Structure formats: C-alpha cells, structure tokens
C-alpha cells in the first residue's frame, strides 16, 4: 500500500506501529506499507524519499515497491510520463539507497514501468545443507 506523506521531515520521524499495521493488513489486499514523499527540486527534478516497513523491520531499498510508486506518481499526475524520478530510501536505518524509476502513460493506463540503480555486494559465502 502506497502511503503518501506531504513532508519529508514527517517521513523521517515516522514511528511505525508494527502491531497495529499487521492487524490492518490482515483485512486488506495490501501486504506492506510503502511511505512516499515526492518533492520537486531545482530545475523541476522530481525526487522522493521512501520508507518500507515489514515484519518488524525496515528495507533499505525496495525495487518492487519503487516501481509501483512510479506508476502511482504518473497515474496521479505527480510525475510526468517518462520522467525519471530519484527515490532515496534507507536513510533512517543508515543504509542509504538510490533508485531511479520512470513509467509511461498511455491514455488512461500506465505502462513500461522501469526501476534501476546500482548495487554493492555486502556479503559472500557458502551454505552447506
């Protein structure tokens, strides 16, 4: 479920009620909450901050939710069709991530949703079963 937040300071200071959220989600088709705060920056660049809470934790980068957010922003006129949007996530948990998203509007439909970014290897190992 995409939850728009007007002010990025509010998003940064969000105290997520995990137990209440789990109860709400049980009666919903949504699986998680993706909090999104889009803001226009200089030169009309659209950037957003996001937070994704799940199972008592927080994800530093959620590409699948970022793609849905791109579609949502285009559908609701926040982002223009094919406009690249930078989504920053994971800042509050000291694992900052940047994802670049865009989506195309085709009449009333949103299509061609794209998510990209860079990744770094955090761990390498072998598991023996």
What are these regions (language model features)?
Residues 1-129:
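Active-site proximal loop and beta-alpha junction motif in alpha/beta enzyme cores
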